[in-house]
Amino acid sequence: MYNKNKLSLSASFNYRDGGEYHDYRDYNSFPNEFWITRQAFKREYKRLNSVLGLQYAATANWTFGFQYIANTNNAKANRITKSSVYQYENSNPFNEILSEVNASQKPKFNSLNLFNEIKLDSLGKKINVNLDYFNYVNFDTRPYEGTSVRKIPFNIQYFNGINNNQQSTNNFSGKVDIELPTTWANWSTGGKISVSKTENYITAFNSGLVTTLNPDLPQINNQYHYDENVQALYVSGNKKINDQFEAQIGLRMEAIQTKSHSGNRNQSIDNKYTKLFPSINLSYSANKNSTYRFSYSKRIARPNFAELNPNLTYVTPFLSVEGNQVLRPYFVDNFEFFYTYKKLETKLYHSLENDVFNQVGLPYLETSNIRLIYKNIFDIRRYGISQTFTFDKLNWWNSINTLNINYSTAKTTDLMATVANGFTSFFTTNNDFNLNKPQTLLFNFSFDYYMFGNYGIDKIKPFTSTSLALQYLLLGKDLKITLKATDVFKTDRFRFTSIVNGVHRSSDYYFDTRMFQLAINYKFGSKKVNVKKRQTGNEDERARTGN
C-alpha cells in the first residue's frame, strides 16, 4: 500500500500451487440390478491472483480511481471410476466398468472497475458511480477411455471419447448509488444495468460400447450462446423513531431478459420477467437487556454460467454430466423474529424457496444409465428455531454456541421423486482463548455437528467437523505466525439418500476439506497508511464465474 497526499496505491499478488482429492461413492438400486460406483478424483492446480488499485482525491469532494483484477489458473485432473453391477440373488458382480478421465482446464479472468465518489455536502450526502467490465475464458478438455467386462457370458467391450469446451463470458455493468441522509431519516437509492454474454464452442465424441475403438475420435461441433440483461432500481430508508424503536424498509425492482440458443438444435429460448424484492427490518429495545427484532426479505438466486451450459460430458457410457440452458433462477422469502436477552438470542424463522434448482441424478430403468443434470425441481417450506448463547465472563475465553432445529416440507416440480419432509438440526461452537497475559498467544477451537437433515428430495445423514488454530504475535503484533487445521478427523462427509424414478440412491461424498496450513504474515511500513477497500459493481456476476 502507498498513500501520500491525494494519491493512494494498492497492489497484491497471490500464488498457490496445490491439489485436492475427492472421493465419491454411489449405490443405486435398479429393479433388476444393484450398482456400486466409486470415483476417485484428483486435481492439481497453479493459481495466480493479482490486484492493482489506484484512487486520487481530485478535490475535497471528488475521488476517482480504478481497480484491476487478473486471475489465471492451470489445472489438471484425473478421475478414475469403477462401477460394479450385481444381480440381487448373487453376491459377486456380473459386470465391471472401469473408466479414466483426464481433464485439463486453463481459465483466465480479467476485470476492470472505474469508480467515482462525489460528496454533495458535509452531512454525508454522496454519489458513487461504478463502471465495470470483466472477461472470463476457459478451455476445458476431457478425454476418457475404459472397458466393460461381463463375466457371464464373458465379454469385453471398450469405450472412449473426448469433450472440448471453449467458454467465454463478457459482462458490462454500470451502477449508481446515492446516499441521502437527512435529519428525519437516512435514505439511499440507486440503480444498475448489467449485460452478460456467454459463448460456448463445444466439440465432442462418444464411442459408446464397442469391440474396436476408433483412434481418430471424430468429433461433432456445437455452439451454445446465452445472453442476460438486468435492469434494477432500489430505494431504502432507515429511521430511528426514538431511543427504543428503529425501522428500515427497502424495495428493489429487477427487470430481466434472457436468451439461450443451441446451435445444433437450432433452438432459442427467451425469458422475460419483472420482479419486486421488498425488505423490512423493525427493532425495539425494551430495556438494556432485552431487544426484539423482526425482518422480512425476498431475494433471487441465479445459476452460474457453467450450470447453464448444456455441454454433455461422459464419465462412463452409463454416467453423464450436463448443464441446462433452460435453468431458471429461484426465489426465497425469509421471515425472522429475534429476541435477545443479555447473552442469549432466540430466533424464530420461516422461509419459502420457490422453483429451487439443483443437480439431480436421473436414472433410466431400461438402460441403467444415470444422467446428472441441473433442473428446477422443488419448492421448500421451512419453519425453525435457533438459540445462540455467548459466554464471555472470563477474559481469557470467549465462546459462541448455536443450536438450530427446523422442519421442512417439499413439493417436486417436473420430477418423479420422493420428497424428504422432516426435521433438520445442527449445533456449532466457536471458542477463542488467550493463553498469556500480553494476549500474544491465541488459540481457537470450533466444532460443527450436523445431527440429521432433509433438503428437497435428499435425506442427509449426520456429520461433524473439527477445526483448530494457534496464532503467535511478535514484534509489537506486526508479525503473525498462524498454524491452522480444518476437519482434523476427516469426518466432514456429505452422505445422503434419495429416490428418483423409483430408483433408491445412497451416496457418500468427501470433498477434501481436511487441511493443515502454516501462515506467516508481517506488516511493515507506516501503520497510518490505509487505502479504502471498495466493492465493484459486478460482484454477483463475477461470483457466477467462480471468481
Language model segments and positions:
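Transmembrane beta-strands of outer-membrane beta-barrel pores
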Residues: 4, 15-19, 70-76, 118-120, ...
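Repeated loop/turn-to-beta-strand initiation elements of outer-membrane beta-barrel proteins
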Residues: 6-9, 19, 61-64, 122-127, ...
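Surface-exposed extracellular loop regions of Gram-negative outer-membrane beta-barrel proteins
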Residues: 16-28, 34-37, 44-53, 57, ...
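Flexible loop and strand-edge segments within Gram-negative outer membrane beta-barrel domains
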Residues: 17-49, 55-57, 61-127, 133-168, ...
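Outer membrane beta-barrel strand-and-loop segments of large Gram-negative receptors
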Residues: 38, 171-175, 216-222, 334, ...
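Signature of Gram-negative outer-membrane beta-barrel scaffolds
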Residues: 188-290
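Outer-membrane beta-barrel signature, preferentially recognizing the C-terminal barrel domain
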Residues: 222-228, 271, 300-354, 370-384, ...
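Conserved C-terminal beta-signal and adjacent last beta-strands/turns
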Residues: 421-547
